[in-house]
Amino acid sequence: MDKILKINNLVIDFESNDSIFRAVDDISLAIEKGKTLSLVGESGSGKSVTALSILQLLPEGTVQYSSESSIKFENDEIIACPKKTLSALRGNKISMIFQEPMTSLNPYQKVGFQIDETLIIHKKLTSKQAREKTIDLLKKVKIPEPERKVDSYPHQLSGGQRQRIMIAMALANEPELLIADEPTTALDVTVEKALLELLSDLQKEFGMSILFITHDLNIVKRFSDEVCVMKEGKIVESGKVKDIFDDPKHPYTIKLLNSIPGKKAELNLENEQLLTGRKVDIKYPIAKNIFGKTVDFLNAVKKVDITIRSGSTTGLVGESGSGKSSLARALLGIEKAEGNIIFDGRNIQQLNSSETRRFKKDFQIVFQDPFGSLSPRMTIGEIVGEGLRVHEPSLIRSEREKKIIKALEDVELDKSSFSRFPHELSGGQRQRVAIARAIILEPKLILLDEPTSALDVSIQMQILHLLKDLQSRLGLAFLCISHDLKVIRFLSDYVYVMKDGIIVEDGTSEDLFESPKQAYTKELLAASLS
């Protein structure tokens, strides 16, 4: 069968501080027309660098290709090709879905305009035709109220909705090759399944080829034709998906296949209540009259009750837009809400300044989008140690650095990352920095917002075991928000299921996963790619 993309002897080096780092080390692969090839491997293995090189999106001036390196799309050599050729390929014949939508979408433009623009440029549609097509695309990727959301700015959408906007934008021009770099990272399981099925349908309809970058081996098994396993810049094993899953040869491939989470958490429900929310209600204004008075609200969270116990993990699941993140922000005290929120015996809505400072140390958060939450102008050491400067100012420099290095080692980052910057790390490594920043203060409660979504499966298991170990050793409580039900099942003692701003079901992890009572919970479990 014809090959739409051929990569031969690809070597990519990065120059930094008078040193050279080899990110991709002499790899070769090919993608057949109408087929899906997945690249899997740990964070930093070279997957995303390989993907970015296809569209020549690596930073100029720091990247070097060997003279033997070749990337051919159909008959066009991409490395060092004219800008005119690249412009004709990017977003038209080749589209890419990036891992972190908040850094890819223009924050100053409405999402509908951003999709319209690519249709007008590449498909020569009128503004009216482009808008009709855009709304149709939003419907396909299951954006609620597409006619209204088309006029939203990126920050007004949930993380999952922003990812779906990126997918719609990539599919707008019906590309011949779609490069998908962790495209479902921020999505709940039902939308993940629907979007992957949508990609498969479009692939069949248009004969589109897909290069899939992922750490989720369940997705690879279900939606890929071939797979290449990468480690330290090299392809260590490749072949048909069935052959790799049924009879892996390389020890690293075997390790990956054995690292898929799924073990049930042991129950721990006898501890005292650390945080309680009673009748938590959150409304957002969505319309004003000519006098500026709010006349319509979106009731994002509706009279919710929630309890988190010391030393236990509470899971919070539901589709994008269900109210999970809004509820979590209210529990953090950064979202205005009605009702009562009691943390460690105190109402957080009535804390004075010193009590608020203590509360902020005791309640840390690991954000969903690590790149968006890490300052690009600070080193990793400065980022991880920032909380120590605020909450433990008496520490001398050597003591502070010792704690920082220990936290980095706890999340499997080498101490050499201390002086590096976020852009020098992979998505998974940046997420581990975010986790290190949270655990370094040894808080009582950590909000885990998709804590392992950017991590490959082997590192994911290490982080999950690390979190449980820290919980046992330090008596930590976790509130875990995730679309990955395998992670929720592994970590959680008690689980709440949210839909349309309300709790539709709650119970122990064992009861909820083994004997769900509500139809929506059953739908979520059925949609999980396990």
Where are these regions (language model features)?
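A short, surface-exposed alpha-helical micro-motif characterized by mixed small hydrophobic
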Residues: V220-R222, I488-F490
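ABC ATPase NBD coupling module
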Residues: Q64, I78-S95, I121, D243-P248, ...
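Conserved ABC ATPase "signature" region
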Residues: Q129-R148, S398-S416
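A short, proline-enriched helix->beta-strand linker immediately N-terminal to the Walker B motif
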Residues: A172-E176, I440-K444
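Conserved ABC ATPase signature
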Residues: S152-L157, Q161, F421-L425, Q429
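Conserved ABC transporter NBD signature motif
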Residues: Q64-E77, G339-N347
